[in-house]
Amino acid sequence: MDTYLVRSAWSGKVLDVPGGSLDNGALVQQFQYNGGTNQHWEFTPVSMGFYKIESESSQKVLDVPGGSLDNGVQIQQFMDNGGTNQHWQLLSAGNGSFYIASESSQKVLDVPGFATGDGVIIQQFQFNGGRNQQWQLIHVADDAQTYKVISVSSGKVLDVPAGQLGDGVQIQQFTDNGGTNQKWEFIPVGNGFYKIASEASEKVLDVPGGSLDNGVQIQQFTDNGGTNQHWQLLPAGNGAFYIMSEASQKVLDVPGFAAGDGVIIQQFQFNGGPNQQWRLVPVG
């Protein structure tokens, strides 16, 4: 199962079960991220593009009370019973965020009145395209894990050329050869972000100087804790992820959909293309 923070694109707060309640009927709120399991949600496919969304702490699922069709109904957690009022669809907002729509009501999760405070109860409301209805799904893991990172467009993997150890070496795509220079450790740094370290060099993926510009080429660099070395994983909805810089809000991108070995990876504004999507395949 995949576990995520569900963060409002409007308020920056995350879905939260108040106090980690285990009760049926506990209302779900937005709250500042604090790392608790009551803010972690497991998305489990149930059918035809729908998911149940289960709290890691309570093992209860997001639920529209009584399957109501009304605007303004507050969302609760409840024991999984297989009802369509507990099934949710992820609809792309086109910016890396999603609308989360109930199968039963066709309403979406909504932060009432564009509120930004802690403790605001989440409601369902008819779709209107507002940012208070958009949610970022940020992959979370408790422990570091090692992956090869495969471009959806080219099938090539992220690679440190010849396993070089120096700072400033630019990261390329290359045919998978199983080398440690193609293995990447995703190490949680908090708030759903990771540093991404080469197994070969022990350097991390880095946006040079924290640049905000499109087309800046990605390098490896000694870990210094900067936000230009922190990355979040945003699901593309097909088992792949967009890998977004905390500093620039740009994503890893294969320039021009290039398919060849040796192409240097850049950052670019999100556009949803397969050249910005990456599959993470665990390696030993």
What are the residue ranges of the model-derived segments?
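A detector of tandem-repeat and repeat-rich interaction/domain scaffolds
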Residues: 29-30, 232
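A short beta-strand-loop micro-motif that forms or neighbors metal/cofactor-
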Residues: 72, 215, 262
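Low-complexity, intrinsically disordered Gly/Pro/Thr-rich segments
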Residues: 122, 263-267
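Extracellular glycan-recognition/adhesion modules and their associated mucin-like linkers
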Residues: 1-22, 40-69, 85-116, 134-165, ...
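Extracellular interaction modules
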Residues: 33-38, 81-85, 126-133, 177-181, ...
